């Protein structure tokens, strides 16, 4: 799921694969997937979350304790702390010599998940790592009714933000105020932020593909380009 950013100016987001599998947006951790056909749900997947840290939670907010409430919320029966992961992996490796990673076997930019498997495999004779990075993209390419409904809701939220921004545009208005109106339009109908920082460029700035400043006053005749 990746390491949390400690920059106060940036909000933390989990890896899209981790979010897809768990639904979690505010917890980092790991998930080990087993046989999905096993009739015992507790043996299908184990979710590992970081231990509670009362000192940090004084500043960042309380996190949920392990228990039925958390299990029901994420739909995963077995949830443990990451401190127990080495013991579980040691037990698993006695029954299989093949580990699969949902992250690409890339020679550079190795994910923490793959790095962990490589460390385990290096200590186990004949242990191999299989690239299964194609599985989740294949699953996500087919949308359920619930997912389609969520996509439509996102479309509606986006449309409202653009409508509000278009109505606000006028000569003398700064680009960042157009951005603020856009994001306000998202928030007021249930949006929780955008996938990336909005690009709002007027005049010549509208031709800059990844324009970032959003800090120019608009003038009469400007074409305003919004990417969000």
Role assignments for model-derived ranges:
Residues 93, 142, 169-170, 218:
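Hydrophobic beta-strand core residues of beta-sandwich domains
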Residues 37, 156, 163, 187, ...:
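Residue-level marker of positions within ordered structural domains that often coincide
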Residues 1-160:
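A composition/biophysics-driven feature that prefers long, compositionally simple stretches
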Residues 7-12, 133, 173-228:
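Short catalytic-site patches enriched in acidic/histidine residues
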């Amino acid at each position: 799921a990746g390491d949390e950013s400690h920059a106060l100016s940036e909000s933390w987001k989990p890896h899209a694969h981790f979010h897809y599998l768990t639904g979690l947006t505010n917890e980092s951790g790991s998930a080990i997937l087993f046989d999905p056909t096993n009739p015992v749900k507790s043996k299908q997947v184990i979710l590992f979350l970081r231990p509670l840290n009362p000192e940090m939670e004084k500043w960042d907010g309380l996190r949920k304790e392990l228990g039925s409430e958390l299990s029901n919320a994420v739909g995963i029966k077995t949830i443990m702390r990451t401190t127990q992961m080495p013991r579980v992996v040691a037990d698993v490796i006695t029954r299989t010599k093949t580990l699969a990673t949902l992250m690409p076997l890339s020679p550079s930019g190795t994910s923490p998940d793959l790095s962990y498997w490589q460390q385990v495999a290096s200590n186990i004779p004949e242990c191999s790592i299989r690239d299964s990075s194609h599985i989740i993209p294949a699953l996500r390419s087919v949308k359920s009714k619930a997912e389609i409904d969520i996509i439509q809701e996102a479309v509606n939220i986006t449309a409202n933000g653009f409508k509000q921004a278009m109505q606000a545009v006028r000569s003398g208005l700064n680009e960042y105020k157009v951005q603020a109106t856009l994001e306000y339009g998202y928030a007021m109908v249930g949006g929780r932020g955008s996938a990336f920082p909005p690009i709002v460029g007027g005049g010549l700035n509208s031709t800059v593909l990844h324009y970032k400043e959003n800090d120019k006053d608009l003038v009469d005749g400007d074409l305003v380009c919004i990417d969000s």
